[in-house]
């Protein structure tokens, strides 16, 4: 929670006064598709990214109401092949390559996109949650898309002993 939710808040708050003084700037927070829907074995991660999404959206609305030329983009990518999610299985939606995500993030910033789910279309999860009964939503995303079982074989990034940790 400190890294995924609080750190982006503190970084943005450090730069925001100068952006407001210049009346230009852009805050881009990288959240996660995991912050858009519940997912077994990801409750804390999902909650931390949900916090980043909510905070970013609130700041965006505040800046918009003040007629500021400072913009906010929130990006919610699916799993990215960085090693962090080693072992994740995705039946329909491909695991994303970092280069692909970077290009989409840059494009979203250049276009002042408020919210970008990656891959495209993934941002419609919110819409689906709003209009579908929970049982139907869970069936589609859990059984058909397979998101609720993506973490079944999760191993995560392998830890490397750097020799810097102290023995207890």
What are the language-model segments listed below?
Residues 35-37:
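Conserved catalytic-site region of short-chain dehydrogenase/reductase
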Residues 32:
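Residue(s) in the substrate-gating loop at a strand-loop-helix junction
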Residues 39-43:
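Active-site loop immediately N-terminal to the catalytic Tyr-X3-Lys motif
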Residues 62-124, 135:
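SDR active-site lid
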Residues 12, 48:
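Active-site helix of classical SDR
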Residues 14-23:
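A short helix-coil junction within the Rossmann-fold of NAD(P)-dependent oxidoreductases
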Residues 9, 45:
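Catalytic tyrosine of NAD(P)H-dependent dehydrogenase/reductases that use a Tyr as the general acid/base
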């Amino acid at each position: 929670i400190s890294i995924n939710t609080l750190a982006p808040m503190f970084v943005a708050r450090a730069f925001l006064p100068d952006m407001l003084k210049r009346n230009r700037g852009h805050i881009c927070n990288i959240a996660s598709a995991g912050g858009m829907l519940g997912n077994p074995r990801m409750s804390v991660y999902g909650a931390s990214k949900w916090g980043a999404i909510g905070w970013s959206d609130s700041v965006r609305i505040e800046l918009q109401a003040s007629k500021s030329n400072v913009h906010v983009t929130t990006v919610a990518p699916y799993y990215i092949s960085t090693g962090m999610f080693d072992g994740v299985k995705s039946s329909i939606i491909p695991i994303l390559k970092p280069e692909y995500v970077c290009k989409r993030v840059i494009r979203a910033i250049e276009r002042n996109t408020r919210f970008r789910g990656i891959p495209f279309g993934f941002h419609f999860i919110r819409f689906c949650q709003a209009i579908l009964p929970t049982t139907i939503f869970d069936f589609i995303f859990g059984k058909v898309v397979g998101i609720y079982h993506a973490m079944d074989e999760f191993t995560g990034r392998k830890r490397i002993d750097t020799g810097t940790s102290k023995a207890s």
